[in-house]
Amino acid sequence: MKISDGNWLIQPGLNLIHPLQVFEVEQQDNEMVVYAAPRDVRERTWQLDTPLFTLRFFSPQEGIVGVRIEHFQGALNNGPHYPLNILQDVKVTIENTERYAEFKSGNLSARVSKGEFWSLDFLRNGERITGSQVKNNGYVQDTNNQRNYMFERLDLGVGETVYGLGERFTALVRNGQTVETWNRDGGTSTEQAYKNIPFYMTNRGYGVLVNHPQCVSFEVGSEKVSKVQFSVESEYLEYFVIDGPTPKAVLDRYTRFTGRPALPPPWSFGLWLTTSFTTNYDEATVNSFIDGMAERNLPLHVFHFDCFWMKAFQWCDFEWDPLTFPDPEGMIRRLKAKGLKICVWINPYIGQKSPVFKELQEKGYLLKRPDGSLWQWDKWQPGLAIYDFTNPDACKWYADKLKGLVAMGVDCFKTDFGERIPIDVQWFDGSDPQKMHNHYAYIYNELVWNVLKDTVGEEEAVLFARSASVGAQKFPVHWGGDCYANYESMAESLRGGLSIGLSGFGFWSHDIGGFENTAPAHVYKRWCAFGLLSSHSRLHGSKSYRVPWAYDDESCDVVRFFTQLKCRMMLYLYREAARANARGTPMMRAMMMEFPDDPACDYLDRQYMLGDNVMVAPVFTEAGDVQFYLPEGRWTHLWHNDELDGSRWHKQQHGFLSLPVYVRDNTLLALGNNDQRPDYVWHEGTAFHLFNLQDGHEAVCEVPAADGSVIFTLKAARTGNTITVTGAGEAKNWTLCLRNVVKVNGLQGGSQAESEQGLVVTPQGNALTITL
């Protein structure tokens, strides 16, 4: 919401009350409580007829400081609330002096100044990183609509850039934007978002989570150009400042607090193909797709049935359309015999035509209006109603239907929709409708996730989810929603992926080739390269099929090349996936996350790091022209082998079987021996590649097992012209390629052979000494 009218005025009809003077400071257990008045109350006369703010400072985890600014404490505060991991034994220090009161957790502290000039400052090791000055937080009375709000304005320094706030398709850097955290089904071409997360971080190495599930209004360097303002309709405002000091460290703390991304199963990293949305399909159509992929030597790993696996107008009652799929169990069995995993589409709604609609209504499993009638409308499905997942019996009914599908052979679910949740309703458990609007996405996906956890096991559970709220990163994978089939939408999708990664989500995908309309072949081929260098890869569309031969013959070559490449890269990719699970670092990440000390990376949103060591710059033109930036160092193309210097921009032109994919120096990268599947024995026949190991540096490569643990570790250390290589753990028949090295002066512990990419060393054991 806009509070100010320029620098001097406030918006008409608003009355602002600010904490201006510290009246008293108390320590209550591990909390510091500050009572602050909106005027000078040293005279007793001024202690009457005035509000008194209560500011509570506490720490749910080390390095995280919570702030709760309260006006009326007796206001209703119904749930839902975010499921946060709050620890009770966090070590804090509280200091109360004549000049200030300070609360400290880890290296982060919050300091409230006493005396004439109010300020609330956040410091890291005594150095201020942000805060709010006089008249920049407090209470807003809106006489236009008789509503009350709380707000805070945190300072932005010179050159400070803001990221996150969920999956957003606008410019990656949020400065200058107004953001309302209200889930909407808006596609990728608008300011609306499927996944609103009231969490942001900055390039100064801290993050802020506003702990309110309802709509939070952010003015990010917009209303006040050097401040992030956030406001909420409430009698209190609670937020957490999360220390870094690096972007990765911020996400580590944030996901420890709100939940780690689960580790998806290895097979989910392969290629997914779907029926598309409104296309005509039956078992014969499905078989033609799958057999066509096999005939063209196109690896395929997951097949997805979209909405029309059920009868029209009845979504979502979980019954196969008997006219289109008369033998679903047999069909699924036949498809799985071909080595495929099966996914089906679901959503949390039910059409009035469904035979089970009356049963659901009578049992109270559907969302009601305050007068007791069902909430219904005719968008999406005629007479559509919404499952009330605050009713445990409704959850059980829904879960039992899903379990029946799993018993039939379904491996996972595309959990679509969940954004357009109304507020003129009465939830079964009395939840606040304003808060449940966004949080519904969490309980919906949690329910489906738990079904898979209870049936196939947590290590095999995976979703394909569109909507999300805080904590939903625990239920991967998420995809970017409805995009158009053009380069602009491809770039929008990438911005959304980088944005959601900066909001705590580890795994992300998008509709390769675009969802709406049918892409020209050149767009499809460029998008395939981008899509298969994403954490998860799915060919999906709306009114047309996405099989590559529907475009041209070269599209088959492109899909084949990049699918095979991804399968070989699984050793690297799954180790990065395990790190996402352990630390919250997204697999696909903005350049600023990996290179926070390089200011040239702050605004980059047309390229990304795929894991720690590989830079990818998708091509957004038919001709193949692409510009990209490489940070400091010497970078090598993953398969072309050309080397480029960093700390500069580069301009190239690429065919459809290529794009900029550069590996940073001092990297030891593992490639597997199987280009047909993502799930195979990764520690057998591993080809390690050593890129530009510099004197005094060590490169380490960890080969994962299917559970994400490390099964083999290879290290290469260089001193002068000598490289010492040692392996530990279980590995068979591995080799080491010294990229762009054509000969060496000495080799102990193995044999050597020439290759186009560099000298290939085959060890006799697990130790090598190489003299350059």
Which residues make up each language-model segment?
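A low-complexity, Ser/Thr/Gly/Pro-enriched, surface-exposed linker/loop concept
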Residues: 2-43, 49-99, 140
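Catalytic and substrate-binding clefts that recognize carbohydrates or anionic sugar/phosphate headgroups
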Residues: 2-4, 15, 47, 70-72, ...
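Short, well-ordered beta-strand segments enriched in hydrophobic/aromatic residues
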Residues: 34-36, 57, 69, 102-107, ...
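Conserved, mostly hydrophobic/aromatic
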Residues: 57, 199, 293, 335, ...
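Aromatic- and carboxylate-enriched substrate-binding clefts and catalytic-loop regions
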Residues: 70-72, 81, 299-559, 594-598, ...
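Solvent-exposed beta-strand/loop surfaces of large extracellular or lumenal domains
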Residues: 77-93, 368, 638-656, 746-765
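Catalytic core of carbohydrate-active enzymes
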Residues: 449-462, 468-479, 492-496, 500-510, ...
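Surface-exposed interaction regions enriched in Ser/Thr/Asp/Glu
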Residues: 764-772
